A protein has these predicted regions:
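Alpha-helical adaptor scaffolds
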Residues: 166-203
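Outer membrane beta-barrel transmembrane domains
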Residues: 195, 203-208, 215-216
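Contiguous, well-ordered alpha-helical segments that form the cores/surfaces of helical PPI scaffolds
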Residues: 61-62, 133, 175-182, 215
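Amphipathic, non-transmembrane alpha-helical secondary structure
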Residues: 36, 82, 197, 213-215
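Alpha-solenoid helical repeat scaffolds
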Residues: 57-58, 129, 172-176, 207-213
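N-terminal alpha-helical interaction modules that lie
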Residues: 1-167, 202
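Short, hydrophobic/aromatic alpha-helical segments in well-folded domains
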Residues: 41, 157-160, 176-177, 181, ...
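Secondary-structure transition/capping residues
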Residues: 33, 102, 188-189, 210
């Protein structure tokens, strides 16, 4: 019993060390080396404890940050976005709320996923946000058909965020809707602009929305 307890304590200390190092480097992420080290430490912490929401959230955010702002190689950026997607999605589908929602719906896997997302609680909004942030960045330069196939699930996640916590990350769901709709064929550009406007109205001092809008 003592050996098992000691191993548990050792693992917990190791996780806490990795998280502390990840947070330390994340706080200095304006430096490229620190941003990459933050992602590295947080990935190791997440591997040891994939059920810790705070670790998953910061890890996925670091994946998005390095993939979007730092990495210049498209394939490596995609790998980072996929890392963030996988970590957050694994967490989402493990929640009781998701599983209960999915279990009540008889249909294919996509429909079950949509039903599960529609049932999740406000507590995991940050996880939803960093999942969809990584996924939408991954899809941004993919063929139109790939983006259309993912549309229903992505829209469900964004609508769930808007219904639970619309101001999360400087009205991030509206900002993401703006970018996604700007790239989808058959969608009125005004729908994209309306979402960018809502994000700016809600968080006028967040420059990221202006930057994303300028891309389109």
């Amino acid at each position: 019993k003592n050996d098992s307890f000691n191993r548990y304590i050792s693992k917990e200390k190791n996780i806490q060390f990795l998280v502390n190092q990840g947070q330390l480097h994340w706080d200095k992420r304006v430096n490229i080396k620190d941003a990459n080290l933050a992602k590295l430490f947080l990935s190791k912490a997440n591997n040891l404890n994939p059920d810790n929401q705070e670790i998953v959230e910061l890890y996925a955010r670091a994946c998005h940050f390095v993939g979007y702002y730092i990495e210049s190689n498209p394939d490596r950026s995609d790998s980072l976005f996929i890392e963030g997607m996988n970590a957050t999605w694994s967490f989402i589908i493990s929640t009781n709320e998701f599983q209960e929602g999915a279990a009540l719906f008889e249909g294919d896997s996509t429909e079950k996923n949509i039903a599960g997302i529609a049932n999740v609680s406000e507590e995991i909004v940050p996880i939803l946000y960093w999942w969809v942030s990584n996924y939408s960045r991954f899809l941004a330069k993919k063929p139109v058909m790939d983006r259309l196939q993912s549309r229903d699930l992505i829209e469900t996640v964004l609508h769930r965020i808007l219904s639970l916590k619309p101001d999360f990350f400087y009205h991030g769901a509206n900002r993401l809707f703006g970018g996604i709709y700007a790239r989808l064929p058959g969608v009125e550009l005004s729908l994209s602009m309306n979402n960018f406007d809502k994000a700016i109205l809600g968080s006028p001092n967040y420059l990221g929305t202006y930057v994303v809008r300028a891309e389109y």
